[in-house]
Amino acid sequence: MPGAKSRFDDFIATHINQTMTIHWTGNFLTWHRYFTWLYEKALQDECGYQGSQPYWNWGLTAITGLETSALFDGSDTSMSGNGVPIPNQPDLILGINVGLPAIYLPSGTGGGCVTSGPFQNMSVNLGPASLELPGGINIQNPNGPFAYNPRCLKRDLTTAINRKFANASSILSNILGPQNINDFQTKMQGVGSDIGIHGGGHFSLGGDPGRDFFVSPGDPAFYLHHGMIDRVWWIWQQMDPQTRANGASAISGTRTFLNNPPSPNTSIEDTVDAGFAAGVPRKIKDLLSTTSGPFCYVYL
């Protein structure tokens, strides 16, 4: 991958390469659980990090607001802050570029380069592959998503999206409502104009690559977002672990995005391959529980 210049970029390249077979698929949750865990292991084993992978509790930032939260206030201990404000940004319009009904989302209070906190001088090297911009614009790198294309990290923090789609009530509804994995992950990924808690986190972060379906791991906050996705799934699993964290009843879906092109149903015997992130290929059945297979963790 010519544009990958670091181990961090290896993870982005992996996500770009597999995007259409890890979203709206039967392996969506297990793939991202393993991916986030591998990132944590790389930080610990290759970078000397002594902590654990934290999660972003969207329910809390929906109360405090994103820019005043400890996570995004731009302090030295944050995940950096907002981007430089771009005034009078129009709404985002999702779906129209792929022939789907339009979903209108408000723009945030930033939009430009991040100028505070640990990632203020960070370079995003890969993409864009499918970057949603205000006004219904979608852009791609004409040289392809894997070409070297260094640019600043941009954010457009949007508390309104956080409060509408990823608040405490929507989290609770996603845990208590669905009684099977198909309904659970469908609700999480969004139905119609409801973008779900998964989309709610991504689009409340905004920016480049935060609004890029393929390149979103290029913002380090991605891993905190997916830590919370994994936590919500884990809580739901604990309500019926025999059914929800074990066997064929724990997964649902096919091997391709919205089954396009048509593909076989995902099996617990299917393999999750982390590609450039360099993890050992694992069977889905070994990734269903956080206390078996390669994993040994629980959530608070």
What residue spans do the PLM features occupy?
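C-terminal accessory segments of proteins
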Residues: 1-300
